[in-house]
Amino acid sequence: MPSSFDLLGEMIGLLQTEQLTSSWACPLPNALTKRQDLWRALINQRPALPLSKDYLNLEDAYLDDWRASFVPVSVKDCQKTNYTSLFLYHGDIRYLAVDAIVNAANSELLGCFSPNHGCIDNAIHTFAGSRLRLACQAIMTEQGRKEAIGQAKLTSAYHLPASYIIHTVGPRITKGHHVSPIRADLLARCYRSSLDLAVKAGLTSLAFCSISTGEFGFPKKEAAQIAIKTVLKWQAEHPESKTLTTIFNTFTSEDKALYDTYLQKENNCE
């Protein structure tokens, strides 16, 4: 069985042969981490075009190795809150073994094309595997237009521990600008659409990232308040959805502190 180091070398070779990205001429690194970075840069930049069976077999083997390198996190491992149907998980959303995780997507729905970018869209697309971008391309081709803010789309999660990914596009807030009622409602719509889609698909566990608070600039405090208030209201309006467990995933200590505070009933944003 080839090592991850060797698999990366073979994948890089195949991707560079295509000459589809700006990194195609980079020399093959001798260090594992540098190979990982180069492979990720190549696959991040690659257009949503079919891939060879040889490449996909190598990627499957590499991402299977990645998947085996950690213990997935289930709902029972998540932090309980004062609400029986709401949980918190502080860490990497890629490690969650739930029915679906929510990806903060962009309007193209094809993932992040910036090499090795730190956004959640990049991380999810990279480690779910290249089939995810192709699946999203099929959705966008059928749809025939950019994805609207506040909608939701469902795909397989491929190599991630989760079964599915729900993709939603949140609103942008220009730095220094206040949150208008329209943008607040658009963010709330992301949560409602994702919950509606989860129920329609028969899912029983759904993990939300902090939608729009990264590259899209939505203030973290207001975003957390909107997220919690919207989910609680949706649950109250959908008593038949009691089987759906909702997890709020936080990645920064600031986000965790906000959700810890607002999920106490005396501070519940309602």
Curated annotation (Swiss-Prot):
Reported function: ADP-ribosylhydrolase that specifically reverses the SirTM-mediated mono-ADP-ribosylation at an asparatate residue of GcvH-L, by releasing ADP-ribose from the target protein. May play a role in the regulation of the response to host-induced oxidative stress.
Protein name: Protein-ADP-ribose hydrolase
Ranges annotated as spanning the membrane: none
Obligatory cofactor(s): Zn(2+)
Top EC class for this record: hydrolase
Upper lineage: Bacteria, Bacillati, Bacillota, Bacilli, Lactobacillales
Binding-site residues for Zn(2+), renumbered to this chain: 112, 117, 119
Annotated binding of ADP-D-ribose, by residue: 92-93, 106, 119-121, 212-216
EC numbers, comma separated: 3.2.1.-
Keyword Cell inner membrane appears in the UniProt entry: no
InterPro entries registered for this protein in UniProt: Macro_dom (IPR002589), Macro_dom-like (IPR043472)
